[in-house]
Amino acid sequence: QDNVTCAGVWLTQSLNQWSEFRASVRCLFVCWLAVLVGSWVVYVEYSSYSELCRGRQCTAAMCAKYRKGLVDGSACSSLCDKDTLELDKCLSTHAAKQVYSGMWGDLEGVVRCRMDEAPAYDVGSQMEAGKEAAALFDTPPTGTSVEKFREMILDHLKAKVDEEQANLGELTARALAAADANKDGRISLAEARSSWALLQLNDFLLALALQERGHTPKILGFCGDLYVTEKVPNAPLYGVRAPAWTPAWVRRAADHWFTPAWHHRAKISMGLLELVEDLFHGAFGSFLMCDLSAAHFGYTGRYDFRVADAQNIVPQATFQEAIRQQRCDRDTDCVYGVDCLTSCDLTKRRCTPEVAEPNLVKACRVLEDYVLQGAPSDIREELEKQLYACMALRGSAEQAEIQHSLVLNNLKTLLWKKISHNKDS
């Protein structure tokens, strides 16, 4: 009996030890898996950061051009000599378009710098990119008069905008005023070359065209085709700026948790509708919004709508010229940016120039999720009706101009009636 008891005790102890061993192995496996996943996340984030965030290289290249006398501007001295314009957090989403938050003295701003896409290991591409970069700052040529430069700008804007009713004379005057960076009443060759390079950028052109409307951040200064704008205090439009690897359901939940109160969202929504109105046959031509992702928009502390990133808002004429050259086999081949779609002409195998959806339709699709949720019960039904009528619009805005304007005004009136009594509206 004692032997049986001893055997039972030994067996029990062995089983306990085996259970403890299995638990230890399981714990070690979980820890190893956590380290592996954590390392993968760190690697992905670092790889993404090192590829996307090359602001130091971009500013160093611009300062080299400044010291050679190729470029000039109100930000050059602060960036290259005094070190009072500093880059902070990387906001880039594309390697060729460096975007950083930064400080310029006491001012918070956003620094944008264009960079060649050629990989560092591709020597041939680097040489070609170098030639293109040098050529970019060769215009206008030495000896160009201010009057000739004015004509060059006007011709460039005509090609970009291509609308008879656009006030291109006023836009040309604004471009010349911006070129005189030190406000001495003269435009140096380096200043002219810098402003010419900036005018090739759609986002800079839009900021110049809408500088009095308040929808785009104010331009604070430039150096070559690097330029600084005011920082939009709250961006993205809703939610938080989550890493790309965050699950979609987490991002969507955050979008709803971190949105402002409804009457503030209504005011922001009115700002978006006013921007759509300004971009449709505005004083300086028509522009198309080719990516209405929430990350590209934001708002101020007073809940005034702002465009945080205008790189995907393009002049309609520029869009039409680019899309006409695009070969296609089906309609899905005819996409510019993210959501500027046209149809495919199968007889020519070319994309047609007319967009399938006007800006207003895409804006209403954003507002359906943004302003309809939590809307007061007394206007929710009518608001939903107007938003659905808006999203049902088809064809370009020119083809249904009256209906386009009617839907836009109905939405603005409905929102304004509800929020006009609020002191911060």
List each model region and its residues.
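Conserved structural core of kinase catalytic domains
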Residues: 143-197, 202, 215-272
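ATP-binding glycine-rich phosphate-binding loop
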Residues: 32-182, 197-201, 210-214
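Protein kinase catalytic-loop region centered on the HRD/HxD motif
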Residues: 274-287
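Catalytic activation segment of kinase domains across protein kinase-like and atypical kinase folds
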Residues: 240, 284-358
